[in-house]
Amino acid sequence: MGALTKAEMAERLYEELGLNKREAKELVELFFEEIRHALEDNEQVKLSGFGNFDLRDKRQRPGRNPKTGEEIPITARRVVTFRPGQKLKARVEAYAGTKP
């Protein structure tokens, strides 16, 4: 199973929408830049029919070095989470098991 890259997304926009390659690449970059800016500003990103990007604060917690067994603290941090929307879930589930 491969991965869809930003370059491939730009190529698809070029092929399907008739944008030139530079415009397609800029469009993809701007899309992700808007998501980054919103998250940096503590905003939730809601993409209708796709899902939501949220920020979550995690508290410090105890951890363990797997090699030595030594206890080490895992520092508090903010993480980005993604929750797929119902439409995306339904489409993915509809194709489950149809491709190797």
Swiss-Prot record:
Heterodimer of an alpha and a beta chain. One of its GO terms (molecular function) is DNA binding. InterPro entries: Hist_DNA-bd, Histone-like_DNA-bd_CS, IHF-like_DNA-bd_dom_sf, IHF_alpha. Transmembrane segments: none annotated. It comes from Pseudomonas entomophila (strain L48). Belongs to the bacterial histone-like protein family. GO terms for cellular component: cytosol. Coiled coil: none annotated. It holds the Pfam family Bac_DNA_binding. This is Integration host factor subunit alpha. Residues 53-72 are annotated as: Disordered. It comes from the Bacteria. This protein is one of the two subunits of integration host factor, a specific DNA-binding protein that functions in genetic recombination as well as in transcriptional and translational control. Keywords: DNA recombination, DNA-binding, Transcription, Transcription regulation, Translation regulation. GO terms for biological process: DNA recombination; positive regulation of metabolic process; regulation of DNA-templated transcription; regulation of translation.
